[in-house]
Curated annotation (Swiss-Prot):
This is ATP phosphoribosyltransferase. Feedback inhibited by histidine. The lineage of its organism: Archaea, Methanobacteriati, Methanobacteriota, Stenosarchaea group, Methanomicrobia. It catalyses: 1-(5-phospho-beta-D-ribosyl)-ATP + diphosphate = 5-phospho-alpha-D-ribose 1-diphosphate + ATP. Its EC number is 2.4.2.17.
Length: 285
C-alpha cells in the first residue's frame, strides 16, 4: 500500500487533484473535509494535510509520497527524495523592506530584525552571506511587521509582487524559487520503488503533455521537406505513406500550443492540407 500526502487546501489543491485525475489515479469518496481518500487503485490511498507538515510526514514514513512546496521542504530540512517538479504553485521567497527605507542591499540589514514565516531558510540565507540579523518568526501577515515596528525587513513569498506593492514594500534580495514537488520517503523508495515509479511516470506524462498539441496533416511528397522544416516537433515529425491517386504522405508532429497559430499558416503556405489539431492527454517518454 502506497500512501500519498496532499495539501488539504490552498490555490494548489484543485490543480493537484486535476493532475491525479489526468494521470488516471481517480479519487473516490472524498470531500475537502476528509482526511483520507481511496483511489481507483486499491493499493494507493491519499491523506490530506497542511503543506507545511507534509515534508515531515514523508520523512518519518507516515506517508510514502507527498506533494508540497520546495519552500516547505527546505524549511523543514527534510531528508526526502525529490522525484518531480510539478511546475505549479510557482512563487519566490524574497527579502523586502519598506519603500521609504534607505536600505538597498541585504548587507545593510546587519544587526537588524527580519520577520518571516520561514526562519530556517532566512537564517541560512543571511549566514551564507556572513550577515548577522535577528530573525523574528511570525505566522501570517508578514507584510505588516515593518510598518508597526516589529521588524526592519521581511522574507516572504510572492508570486506576482502585487501584495508587496500594495503594502509599500520593495524587494532587495531573492532567497528561493519554489513550486510544488513530488517527494518520496527514502525507506519507501527502497521498499515500494516499482509502485512509486509507476505513480511518478503517470504524473510526469500528464505534465509533459501540458501546452502541447498533436498535429496531423496530408502533404504532397514534393512539399514534404518544406513542411518538415516548419515543424518544431519533439524529435522530428512522423511521416507515413498514404494510399492516394498522387504521391502523398501523412505527417504527424507534437507542437507547442503557443506556436500553433503560426505553424498552421506556415504549413498551409508550403502545401500541407487536411490539418487536424488534437489535444494530448499524456506523453510518456
Amino acid at each position: 500500500m502506497v500512501r500519498i500526502a496532499l495539501p488539504n487546501k490552498g490555490r494548489v489543491y484543485e490543480p493537484i487533484m486535476s493532475l491525479f485525475e489526468g494521470a488516471g489515479l481517480h479519487v473516490i469518496e472524498h470531500s475537502q473535509r476528509s482526511l483520507f481518500a481511496k483511489t481507483v487503485d486499491e493499493n494507493i490511498t491519499m491523506l490530506f494535510a497542511r503543506s507545511r507538515d507534509i515534508p515531515g510526514y514523508v520523512e518519518n514514513g507516515a506517508a510514502d509520497l507527498g506533494i508540497t512546496g520546495e519552500d516547505f521542504i527546505q524549511e523543514a530540512g527534510a531528508d526526502v527524495e525529490v522525484l518531480l517538479d510539478l511546475g505549479m504553485g510557482k512563487a519566490e521567497l524574497v527579502l523586502a523592506v519598506p519603500e521609504a527605507s534607505a536600505i538597498e542591499r541585504p548587507e545593510q540589514l546587519a544587526g537588524k530584525k527580519v520577520a518571516t514565516e520561514f526562519p530556517e531558510i532566512t537564517k541560512k540565507y543571511f549566514a551564507t552571506r556572513g550577515i548577522s540579523v535577528h530573525v523574528v518568526e511570525v505566522c501570517g501577515a508578514t507584510e505588516i511587521t515593518p510598518h508597526i515596528g516589529v521588524a526592519d525587513a521581511i522574507v516572504d513569498l510572492t508570486s506576482t509582487g502585487t501584495s508587496l506593492s500594495m503594502n509599500r514594500l520593495k524587494i532587495i534580495g531573492r532567497v528561493l524559487r519554489t513550486s510544488q514537488r513530488l517527494i518520496a520517503s527514502k525507506a519507501s523508495l527502497a521498499q515500494d520503488g516499482r509502485k512509486i515509479s509507476e505513480i511518478t511516470l503517470a504524473l510526469q506524462s500528464v505534465i509533459e503533455a501540458r501546452g502541447k498539441r498533436y498535429l496531423m496533416m496530408n502533404v504532397p511528397e514534393g512539399a514534404l521537406e518544406a513542411v518538415k522544416k516548419k515543424l518544431p516537433g519533439l524529435a522530428g515529425p512522423t511521416v507515413l505513406k498514404v494510399e492516394a491517386d498522387s504521391p502523398m504522405c501523412a505527417v504527424h508532429a507534437v507542437v507547442p500550443e503557443n506556436e500553433i497559430y503560426r505553424v498552421i499558416n506556415d504549413l498551409k503556405e508550403v502545401g500541407a492540407r487536411d490539418i487536424l489539431i488534437v489535444p494530448i492527454e499524456r506523453i510518456v517518454r
